[in-house]
Amino acid sequence: MKTETIKCRTLMVSDWCCDQHGFPMQITNVGDDYAYATFEGNEGDPWEFDDKDDQPHPIILTPEILEKNGWYFGLTSDEEDAEYSLGGCHYDRHWTYDEGAGSISLIFPNDADGGELIIDDQSFNRHLNLVFCDTLHVHELQRTLRLCGLNELADNFKV
């Protein structure tokens, strides 16, 4: 059985990935064909991934990981009456992260992989929708949060 892997150069510092056994690690350094990662209790002796022999693997984003990072299942009060659809499908899994002046919604459709990440930041009068098509992995959510200017939230993510 072939498992999904990540090219080292596509990772960023603070991204979460795992080894071939599923052990979670956080990236500390990235090169063209290698990446260093560390895990709790082993900060002084980093693990080396490479694109040839020991490739990093993605960590699937789960409800438990979202809850550990302050996300909650359901809609914000502003969204309770709204109906979400994308391409005619309705969503059955909606996760929200409130950051005071705005909220972040992660929405999964009930009949297909993929979904939508909505940033509603009222403090900057900004509303941003990002659509993803595949199963969302932790490092992909981290990257998306960084692209939206939410570096602290992305870099302090826990698995």
Predicted features along the sequence, with ranges:
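Intrinsically disordered, low-complexity, charged/polar segments
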Residues: E43-Y72, H127-F157
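Short acidic/polar mixed-charge low-complexity motifs
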Residues: H21-P24, D45, G102
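Short beta-strand-centered aromatic/proline hotspots
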Residues: W16, G22-D33
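Amphipathic, interaction-prone secondary-structure segments
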Residues: F73-A112
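Basic/aromatic-rich interaction segments and small domains that mediate binding to polyanionic partners
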Residues: T28-D51
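Mixed-charge, Lys/Arg-rich low-complexity intrinsically disordered regions
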Residues: M1-L11
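Intrinsically disordered, low-complexity regulatory segments enriched in Ser/Thr/Pro
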Residues: A101-T135
